[in-house]
Structures are given as C-alpha cells and as structure tokens.
Amino acid sequence: MLNQFELCSAPVTAAAYEKCDSIVLFLCKECAPAVPQLELPVEVEKAVEAYLAAHDDVYDVGALTSFVLPTEGGLLQLIIAGCGEGSDCKPNNFRKAAGEAARALHKAKARQAVCAAPILLNPQRGFYAQAIAEGLFLGGYTFNRFKSEAKEAPLCAVKLLSSAEDSAKLVEVAEIEAEAVCFTRDLVNNPGNIVTPQVMVEAALAMGKELPLEVTVLDEVLLKDRGMEAILAVGRGSENPPRMIALQYNGAGDAPYTAFVGKGVTFDSGGISIKPDDNMGEMKDDMTGAADVLGAMRAIARLGLPCNVIGVLACAENMPDGRAQRPGDIVRAANGKTIEVVSTDAEGRMVLADGVWYACRLGAKKVIDIATLTGAVIIALGNETSGIVANNDELVEQLKLAGKYAGENYWQLPALPECKEAVKSDVADLLNSAGRAGGVITGGLFIGEFVDKGLPWAHIDIGGTSTATKTEGVKVKGGTGFGTLTLIKLAGML
C-alpha cells in the first residue's frame, strides 16, 4: 500500500467492475472509439457516450470530469480523465491525468475503484499501465507529519484494467519507483531541525540493513584525513558536522560503476554571505540532490537492477558563526586544487567538489552529480526543466531519454571553454562563484574540475524543479522528488 492506494492489475472484463464505487476512465481522443470494448456497466457507457458527443475539451491533459450515476448497485462516481489527442497522447499525459485522478478519488473517499483506458486494450501498451500507476501513487502523496489532527484518506483498492501481459509486473515496478520518489519527498519536506547530515547517515544505514547496499560513512575526522577541506569548510559554522556517505550497489558483477553524487546541504542560510530572510525557510530543500540519490539507490536495490551504481551524498549544513568560512578564504579540496571563496552562499559546488572526487576514488567510471545549485537555472529554464552541463554528449542523451521515460524534462547548456576561464582565480586555482553571467554553466564547470580527467560526467541543476508551489499532475505542493525517477530509469539503461 502506498499513499492509501492498494493497486493491482486485472484483465478487462465486465466482472471487474462489480462492487466498485468509482470508475476512472483515461481517455485520449484517438482511443475514444474503443470505449465500448472496455465492457463498462451499461449506465456508465451510455453516460460516457453522451458526454463525449457534446464536449470536445474532455481530452485536455489532466482535465477531470466527474459524475455521480445511479446504478443497480447504488451510486457510482465516474471520472473521465483527459490524456490528450494526436501525437500528444504520450505516457506522461496518462501519468499526469492519474495524479489528478488520485486526488479526486481521495476527495470522494472512494473505497473500491476501477481504472480503465482504451489504450490498455492493446497488449503492447503495458508501459501506459505503469505510467498510470506511477501517477496514482505520486498524485496521492501527502505530507502531514506535523499536523496535530492529520486526516488520512480511506484505503482505496484500485483495479487497473489492462490486456497487456506485462501490466502486473510493471505496476509492481511503478509502486517501487513511486515509493522511492515519495521517500525523497519526505526527506525534502522535513525541516532543517529534523533532517541534519547525521539523519541522512541514519537513513542510509537503515537502507543498508534492509537492502543489498554497502554503506560507508566519513565523519569530520575521516574527511580531514582524506583532505576533503571543501566540504569541511562549508560545514565549519554548524553544530551539525558534515558527512560524506557512500552506498554501493553491485548488480552486474565486474561491470564498471556509475556514480550518482547528490548535494546534501540540509539547510542553507548562505553562511556569512547570508541570504535574505524572505523565504529562507525554503532552504531546507537544499539537500534535494542527496535525497534524490538516496531514493534512487533505494529503488535500484529493491528492483534488483542489473547494474553497478555508487550513490554519494555530500552532506553539510551551511551556517554563520565565529568558526564559519569567510568570503576571501582559500581552501584546498581533496584533489589538491585550491578554491577562493568568493561567496559562502556558493557552497553546494564545494561539497560536490569533494563528493565527485570521492566517487572517482571509489572506482566510478562515469559520474553524474545532481544539485539545487543555482537560482540562475530558474531564470534560464523555468520550473519545469532542469539544466545539464556535461563533457559527454552520449551521457547527456542517456539522461534525456531517462528523463523522457520518467516524465522529467532536461536541457543541455553549452560548456564553452570561455566559461571555464571564468571560474579561474587570480590568487587560487578556482573561484567558487564566477558571478551572474552564465551561472548555471560556470557552477557546473566548477564541479567538473574535480572529476578525474577523461571520465564521462554530467551535472544536473534542479534549482527550479526541486519544489512545486502548487499541486498539479503528479506534483504535490512542496518537494517534488524531481530527479529520483530519472536516476532510476537511467540505472535501468546502464
């Protein structure tokens, strides 16, 4: 059970609708003529036919139309969920529509629901069942841990009707993947006084006991022994010392390892370069990259994917006090390069500098880092698309394809040599902030300086996608878990 839904796949038969109190019909325009083949109850089929004949906007993606119909078994709620038309009839539309439907079912206090879609009459379209299942689980997410009188929706048993033989397996996969995204969301939505670097350690260790993951933790003593002065500098002003966490998963024998490295700044005040107080509380989400990696490793291990992956969480809290790093300080990262601290609020790239270096020491032959790195990415790409800076176009295409399967959008920015010049310092090797111009690019290129030469590397900036300001589709206001599903899908492609 996930988010009050108990979901199973079932064949398309008239008997499947018996005893249900709700039916959700997922419709794209091209598939609408096949509605009679769904063996809906007679009253429902007539209502659908009449409504479709009179309304053209029913197919708009995410649009919901609800009826309460009298039937022989009593009152029944019918929800028609629009999924697009023409070439726009993609799995992600069904995922979004299912997210909307999940909240409608919760609101109606549904107990027994059936989800049907003409497109699932095609035995080759099981992946649409997976998309619908993901949407139901993600759209039904709630975070009410701190509500004194939290109200849970009743448990709703859902049958997802499909003629595809692989639907049952894909629905199981969807539940594991969605649980991982919700795990990420929970971490992100908790406040900074709850989630600290040590709490991230405890979450990783708990996963290591439950799943085939080898967990290694570097505390401040071990970080110093390994020369990781960049992450230590970021955490110096906090009473919660930094931690570097590694989770190793071996599902492919001697195959090379890919590393996912996440920024885990559990609260970012900006340090001495302190942020404005407006919305500073939102900086509890500055550990989303690390949460993404932890959630992805959870699903990868649960699914038993045939790949070798190392997850690295570079965790620290960025606070101002008498011991905190100062603008103008120069620190030496683990790979020996020196960093001039222009702004203590450009701390994410510093923890990742040691994080990607550590991933290389653990044997990674491909490195992907993910971080709420900049506000500049919001100006460049908005809140629906994450930016990529990379040294390998093949890896970028893999990420984009994984994102397509996950319903998450990415755009590559140019890693020009001129931009790399911008991160050079007059008094040290590198600047931790090169100013406003090309901020997404220069931030990414800074991190790339700490990846072993010749290794494929990509940086993902989720600064604009890590949280949602409103609930729509699969997104629920708060932490989105953007990136978790992409990393899982990518691991399945390795």
Ranges and model annotations:
Residues 1-264:
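Short amphipathic alpha-helical segment within the helicase RecA-like ATPase core
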